[in-house]
């Protein structure tokens, strides 16, 4: 029996053991875990330093190092996130509908756990805790497989969670970490249909594509953010400037950061110099511009076809000039990763058309795409941003980690 198979068996058994846990027990444990994270900050930072040292040795960029880095403040924020999950309403057992049918059967549809969730993710060690807390709150066991660059951090975090579970009298196998970073083991997890009920990949386009090609278990796609902002002919250009600066430069390494700028030709000659001057005062950006946009920049490079398909996660942005709203919508739908898209305009009809026709989980009017986030949407914590349409779409909250079951009660009923 392989290690992955043993891990899967333990996760399946754990899912049955935690399925009956009450809301009170779950919330009490999550509060305990939140405190333990803060109390054990120095141990977690020491583990993270090993990952940072390895990353530096391998020449990882400063932006990617930032994704990997833990600090006392970040650990405190992770702990606060766990407590916020404890404070959320528990969806498990919620009655969606109930009725008595014509045969006199009493029928209830309730929310129930999915069972075993597997998560494959990259870089950010906070995902270990975020994903566990959401899975635990919904009575799911979880198998975590992080990137090798965050292995020491993930091991320390999962060890702390397992110790806390054991001290609370709860099976520590409610969370398990795949420590082998090999692709073969990851592929085995993707195909563990006997044990895994759903797989959630969270990372870059290459990871998502690999999972889509290799997985045999059900998959919920998340994460890739080839996000666009369209500056319409009727845009407030000051507003557009502020929004683009925020969406591109505030945190370029996150999936809701803007990667592509689409501009109506009626305002391009005014807007591009205005934006370039303003953004250079905050954080210079490398512009990869099409033929119409290129001569309007003081400093830019010609865009290649692949630039319009790329999630840069850096201070780089593609630029496309279009002649109409319809062309903008068509261009975005051709290149979007279906995450978040935005239009800047004072034209109400254009805004409504854009929101109706752009194929993305979140579509903004006159706002930064950086708001696509479970907490910001008032949903509480999220396990990722789903970019597909089935089961869940957009920020995945607690309800997205549940299924439903019909409970039918009769009194000797038989069907004639």
UniProtKB/Swiss-Prot annotation:
One of its GO terms (biological process) is L-proline biosynthetic process. Pathway: Amino-acid biosynthesis; L-proline biosynthesis; L-glutamate 5-semialdehyde from L-glutamate: step 2/2. One of its GO terms (cellular component) is cytoplasm. It comes from the Bacteria. SUPFAM superfamilies: ALDH-like. It is found in: Cytoplasm. GO terms for molecular function: glutamate-5-semialdehyde dehydrogenase activity; NADP binding. Its EC number is 1.2.1.41. It catalyses: L-glutamate 5-semialdehyde + phosphate + NADP(+) = L-glutamyl 5-phosphate + NADPH + H(+). Keywords: Amino-acid biosynthesis, Cytoplasm, NADP, Oxidoreductase, Proline biosynthesis. Transmembrane segments: none annotated. HAMAP family: ProA (MF_00412). Belongs to the gamma-glutamyl phosphate reductase family. NCBIfam families: PRK00197.1, proA. This is Gamma-glutamyl phosphate reductase. It comes from Streptococcus pyogenes serotype M12 (strain MGAS9429).
């Amino acid at each position: 029996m392989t290690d992955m198979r043993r891990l899967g068996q333990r996760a399946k058994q754990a899912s049955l053991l935690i399925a009956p846990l009450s809301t009170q027990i779950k919330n009490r444990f999550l509060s305990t875990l939140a405190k333990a994270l803060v109390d054990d900050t120095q141990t977690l930072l020491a583990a993270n330093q090993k990952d940072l040292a390895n990353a530096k040795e391998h020449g990882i960029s400063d932006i990617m190092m930032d994704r990997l880095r833990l600090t006392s403040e970040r650990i405190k924020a992770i702990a606060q996130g766990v407590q916020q999950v404890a404070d959320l309403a528990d969806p498990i057992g919620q009655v969606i509908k109930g009725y008595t049918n014509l045969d006199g059967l009493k029928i209830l549809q309730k929310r129930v756990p999915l069972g075993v969730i597997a998560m494959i993710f990259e870089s950010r060690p906070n995902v270990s805790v975020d994903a566990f807390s959401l899975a635990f709150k919904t009575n799911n066991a979880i198998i975590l497989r992080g990137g090798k660059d965050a292995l020491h951090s993930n091991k320390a975090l999962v060890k702390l969670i397992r110790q806390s579970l054991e001290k609370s009298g709860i099976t520590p196998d409610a969370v398990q970490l795949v420590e082998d970073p090999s692709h073969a083991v990851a592929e085995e997890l993707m195909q563990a249909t006997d044990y895994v009920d759903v797989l959630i990949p969270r990372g870059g386009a290459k990871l998502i594509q690999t999972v889509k090609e290799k997985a045999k278990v059900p998959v919920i796609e998340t994460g890739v953010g080839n996000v666009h902002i369209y500056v319409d002919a009727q845009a407030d250009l000051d507003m557009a400037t502020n929004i683009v600066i925020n969406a591109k430069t505030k945190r370029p390494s996150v999936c809701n950061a803007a990667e592509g700028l689409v501009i109506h030709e009626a305002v391009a000659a005014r807007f591009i110099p205005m934006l370039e001057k303003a953004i250079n005062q905050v954080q210079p950006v490398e512009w990869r511009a099409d033929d119409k946009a290129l001569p309007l920049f003081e400093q830019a490079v010609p865009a290649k076809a692949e630039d319009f398909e790329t999630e840069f996660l850096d201070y780089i942005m593609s630029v496309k000039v279009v002649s109409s709203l319809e062309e903008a919508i068509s261009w975005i739908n051709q290149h979007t990763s279906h995450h978040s898209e935005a239009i800047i305009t004072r034209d109400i009809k254009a805004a409504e058309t854009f929101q109706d026709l752009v194929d993305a989980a979140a579509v903004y009017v006159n706002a930064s795409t950086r708001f696509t986030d479970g907490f910001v949407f008032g949903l509480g914590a999220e396990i990722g941003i789903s970019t597909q349409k089935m089961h869940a779409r957009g920020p995945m909250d607690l309800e997205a980690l549940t299924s439903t079951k019909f409970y039918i009660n009769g009194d000797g009923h038989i069907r004639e």
